[in-house]
């Protein structure tokens, strides 16, 4: 039995769906009503990471875990890893981030992810880390501005990033969960090319068949917007991450998707064509 966490998110949803197509899968969900993965082989345990009793129920009889955590202010990786060790789990595949490999990345979120990875190592459960670059699906946050005004606003227009389709990240994770020889490995995962926000805007314009305008926000405006949504350390982490991207730190392409799945990573032009409806006027 494989336990999937984060199954309402971009990657966890895909991991759960792929596993459910092949056999039984268990999902730990704080809000089960938000799950889109259904089926006779899908078992759902309601609970949060801070609920040890729910964790113990979810982990009973489980061989492997796909772990996704989202709140860098909470010790959720440590909680799950400790419970997994107590339950005798044989493999824990954690969704991390490629920035942990960058020596100059010292923002709050990246530091916490390094600490989270170490907590998993320290648990004694055999581990695999999947470290993706920025998700292509993050551009869905542009949809309201595109639909209402035909405009994309982002901090830097010409900062390249080798963004990756969440489905490719999920495929790598499933390969690690169901294959052999992945324990003790960390897999960086990128898309097939580095692309800028301005280039993404142009691609979306082609897909939608309508002109789109790109507007660069500037640091002050971006900080104001982020501070309205996130705690200060998290908001500042996003700004520092964007600055690293501006200097080219996120442009490297790696062949992991091809190596682990046998097919090339999807480019942004394919992702945008498949998700055009999300950006189309209502």
Curated annotation (Swiss-Prot):
GO terms for molecular function: oxidoreductase activity. Its EC number is 1.3.1.113. It is an enzyme of class 1 (oxidoreductase). InterPro entries: Ergot_Alk_Oxidoreductase, NAD(P)-bd_dom_sf, NmrA-like. Pfam families: NmrA. Keywords: NADP, Oxidoreductase. NADP(+) binds at residues 6-11. The keyword Oxidoreductase applies. Disulfide bonds: none annotated. The keyword NADP applies. It catalyses: a [(3S,4R)-4-alkanoyl-5-oxooxolan-3-yl]methyl phosphate + NADP(+) = a (4-alkanoyl-5-oxo-2,5-dihydrofuran-3-yl)methyl phosphate + NADPH + H(+); [(3S,4R)-4-(6-methylheptanoyl)-5-oxooxolan-3-yl]methyl phosphate + NADP(+) = [4-(6-methylheptanoyl)-5-oxo-2H-furan-3-yl]methyl phosphate + NADPH + H(+). Belongs to the NmrA-type oxidoreductase family. PANTHER family: PRESTALK A DIFFERENTIATION PROTEIN A, PTHR43162. Involved in the biosynthesis of A factor (2-isocapryloyl-3R-hydroxymethyl-gamma-butyrolactone), a gamma-butyrolactone autoregulator that triggers secondary metabolism and morphogenesis in Streptomyces. Catalyzes the reduction of the butenolide phosphate produced by nonenzymatic intramolecular condensation of the 8-methyl-3-oxononanoyl-DHAP ester. This is (4-alkanoyl-5-oxo-2,5-dihydrofuran-3-yl)methyl phosphate reductase.
